[in-house]
């Protein structure tokens, strides 16, 4: 039995699974075939449990397809073996691979940047910007952010490993910054002397400008290239800043060559960031790119309940559901609304009920209901897909019309409080089962198609802004 068996499995899994799933869970596996047993080695227990739970059946089916009655037994283990590396590593992206830094190399610790002599900077340490309050433990996981959290967790456990760089993207207030800090805290927890730097992209630009003004560009380079992990928020602000992009390009390459972790966030997919050089956007995708979507209803409720618990506030479940049903755009908006409710309750001494929330959030709820209507959804979707609203209401079944119609129905269910029959009536008198089918179809396509996933996220962001 040839060792190419696992390579055949990899090829099939690559074709069958969404690219993000394959990169996150299958690519890190290493394989060893001996004594009619195929041993799969996962980098940590988390990956092992996930693969065994989610993909065991897929792998067994492939082994049976390729080998029939001679299919090997499957065994999972945590770790790796030197002999395994060459035979089981999946194909890498088509870019020049950079070599790992020699094991004996010791990086000098980043010291206070010499280009900034302000009093505030004098107290600076290279990890002071990592917020200890943002951890994986208090990050509420749901379907919308599950992959992003799992990838971030693996990076924290194994910085500089499989997912480098890690690129997280999604709308404002969805938890990207929280995950950046959580990774930083995770790395520091495992290695207290780790050199972890978190910053907004504009700070990188400001530091570079100061370095140029003070003729200290070499110190600037040494500082940023000596970290163990560089976490940069809102990378889209590099747009049209050519000198900053040039310097970051070389910093990026140096960090990758030294197996130093890079994590970036943006409000959009890398290739959609305007004003950033193609060579940078290409590098952003070298590791793993994961979207964070607006939280679904159950996650929004869980976020509210956890936030209330952190504030020692008893929040009735029906109240959390009431708020979550009406405020859908992002986590920050949810937490802001809850803070407002809590403050009002403290000031007035009243119990938190649905009627009390209606009163405390009266203007916010009224604005939401005014902004997100079925009519508004139909107009926005029609404009997005460059069709007419009349097409959405018509009986036409061509894909160019049917898919936008399904998208609009799914958005109406997600963003309004209308029932399925009411939504159907608003779309040319369609039956509620048609609406239900549309919602399920869009949910399925969001799992299978990056384009549909992006369309849904973009439309929600537009309608919620």
Swiss-Prot record:
Residues 129-345 are annotated as: Domain III, AAA+ region. Residues 346-465 are annotated as: Domain IV, binds dsDNA. Belongs to the DnaA family. One of its GO terms (biological process) is regulation of DNA replication. One of its GO terms (cellular component) is cytoplasm. Residues 1-84 are annotated as: Domain I, interacts with DnaA modulators. ATP binds at residues 173, 175-177. Residues 91-120 are annotated as: Disordered. It is found in: Cytoplasm. Plays an essential role in the initiation and regulation of chromosomal replication. ATP-DnaA binds to the origin of replication (oriC) to initiate formation of the DNA replication initiation complex once per cell cycle. Binds the DnaA box (a 9 base pair repeat at the origin) and separates the double-stranded (ds)DNA. Forms a right-handed helical filament on oriC DNA; dsDNA binds to the exterior of the filament while single-stranded (ss)DNA is stabiized in the filament's interior. Residues 84-128 are annotated as: Domain II. Domain I is involved in oligomerization and binding regulators, domain II is flexibile and of varying length in different bacteria, domain III forms the AAA+ region, while domain IV binds dsDNA. Keywords: ATP-binding, Cytoplasm, DNA replication, DNA-binding, Lipid-binding, Nucleotide-binding. Oligomerizes as a right-handed, spiral filament on DNA at oriC. This is Chromosomal replication initiator protein DnaA. It holds the Pfam family Bac_DnaA. Its main location: cytoplasm. GO terms for molecular function: ATP binding; ATP hydrolysis activity; DNA replication origin binding; lipid binding. InterPro entries: AAA+_ATPase, Chromosome_initiator_DnaA, Chromosome_initiator_DnaA-like, Chromosome_initiator_DnaA_CS, DnaA_C, DnaA_dom, DnaA_N_dom, DnaA_N_sf.
């Amino acid at each position: 039995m040839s060792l190419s068996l696992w390579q055949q499995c990899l090829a099939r899994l690559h074709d069958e699974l969404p690219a993000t799933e394959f990169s996150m869970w299958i690519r890190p596996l290493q394989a060893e075939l001996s004594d009619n047993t195929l041993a799969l080695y996962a980098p940590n227990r988390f990956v092992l449990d996930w693969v065994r739970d989610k993909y065991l059946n897929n792998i067994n089916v492939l082994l049976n397809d390729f080998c029939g009655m001679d299919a090997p037994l499957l065994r999972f283990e945590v770790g790796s073996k030197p002999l395994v590396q060459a035979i089981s590593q999946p194909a890498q992206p088509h870019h020049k691979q950079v070599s790992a830094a020699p094991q004996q190399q010791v990086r000098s610790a980043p010291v206070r940047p010499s280009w900034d002599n302000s009093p505030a900077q004098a107290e600076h340490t290279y990890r002071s910007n990592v917020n200890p309050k943002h951890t994986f433990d208090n990050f509420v996981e749901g379907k919308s952010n599950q992959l992003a959290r799992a990838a971030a967790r693996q990076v924290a456990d194994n910085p500089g490993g499989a997912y480098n760089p890690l690129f997280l993207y999604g709308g404002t207030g969805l938890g990207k910054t929280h995950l950046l800090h959580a990774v930083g805290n995770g790395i520091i927890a495992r290695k207290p002397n780790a050199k972890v730097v978190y910053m907004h992209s504009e700070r990188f630009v400001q530091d570079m400008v100061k370095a140029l003004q003070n003729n200290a560009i070499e110190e600037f380079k040494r500082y940023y290239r000596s970290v163990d992990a560089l976490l940069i928020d809102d990378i889209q602000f590099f747009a049209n800043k050519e000198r900053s992009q040039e310097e970051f390009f070389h910093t990026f390459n140096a960090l990758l060559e030294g197996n130093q972790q890079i994590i970036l966030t943006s409000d959009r997919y890398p290739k959609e960031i305007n004003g950033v050089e193609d060579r940078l956007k290409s590098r952003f995708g070298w590791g793993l790119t994961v979207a964070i979507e607006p939280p679904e209803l159950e996650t929004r409720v869980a976020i509210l309940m956890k936030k209330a618990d952190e504030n020692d506030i008893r929040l009735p479940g029906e109240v959390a559901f009431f708020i979550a049903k009406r405020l859908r755009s992002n986590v920050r908006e949810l937490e802001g609304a809850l803070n407002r409710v809590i403050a009002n309750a403290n000031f007035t001494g009243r119990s938190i009920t649905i009627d009390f929330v209606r009163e405390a959030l009266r203007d916010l709820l009224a604005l939401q209901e005014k902004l997100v209507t079925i009519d508004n959804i139909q107009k926005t979707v029609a404009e997005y897909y460059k069709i007419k609203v009349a097409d959405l209401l018509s009986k036409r079944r061509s894909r160019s019309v049917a898919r936008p119609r399904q998208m609009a129905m799914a958005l109406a269910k997600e963003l309004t409080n209308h029932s399925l029959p009411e939504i159907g009536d608003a779309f040319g008198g369609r039956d509620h089962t048609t609406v239900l089918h549309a919602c399920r179809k869009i949910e399925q396509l969001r799992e299978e198609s990056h384009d549909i996933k992006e369309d849904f996220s973009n439309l929600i962001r537009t309608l919620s802004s």
